[in-house]
Amino acid sequence: MRRFFFMLTCVALVIPGAAFSKIKVAASITDLASIASSVGGDQVECFAIAKATADAHRVEVLPSYMVKVSKANVYLKGGLGLDQWSDAIIDGSRNDRLTVVDCSAGVSVLEKPAGAVDASMGDVHPNGNPHYWLDPRNGGVVARTIAEALGRVDPAHAADYQSRAEQFAQQCDASYAADRKIADAIPNRVVFTYHRSWPYFANAFGFEIAGQAEPVPGIPPTAKHLADLVSIAKSRKIAVLIQEPYFSADAGKFLQREAGVQSVVMPLSCDGAEAGSYLAHIDAVLKALAAVKGES
């Protein structure tokens, strides 16, 4: 009998997965993968489908994604219509054991349409704006949602996940407090954005979005609309256009030439800026805005 247990111990030491297999977590976007890594610690292995610099609304569904998700235990969706392509990946994975989590649950959603939504309004999300992670105060909400899901999949470590989620929520609060001081030192926080991606960020840090380069969400800028923005920029001394890297730079160049507006090109998700983690990315966006001449 002793020899039997000795051999089992040796197998566990040589092949760690035989004794302690990690929970595999797939996430639609890198921010959710980053938060899940903080919550899961050594018990999880996380990967994201969409790259940080990609448009998370439009991801090509590849068979390789389905294969990866077929081996996952948990799939984290952004929700609110952000990543509807996730459904095709989940269905194609044929993974009946997969726990699917809507990470928007519990978040205070902004920009819910008051009435019916139609095509004339552009790419409007009927359940509200889906870019909630750009307010770091929502990071703790998401962390707790992820911890609850991981605890259901792996009850033996449920307390660990909950503890790490609370620690992460505290980190989010501390990071927000520090970054809010940076934001409050910016004298003019009236900005343009290319797309309606930044309301949560603006709400968190006291920015006012005076207009978008797109006349309506998803519709490219028109000459008349850009001319209107030039007038607004001059009258309100707007110095910044916040733009994602996958949009054309033409509108930004026009606004800079005609009104001195500078483009700050930043991804919506972590790993696309200088800093790799969720909170570090938000910090990097804020510091990039503070560094613009005329803003600080």
Where are the predicted features?
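Extracytoplasmic metal-acquisition and chelation regions
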Residues: F20-S296
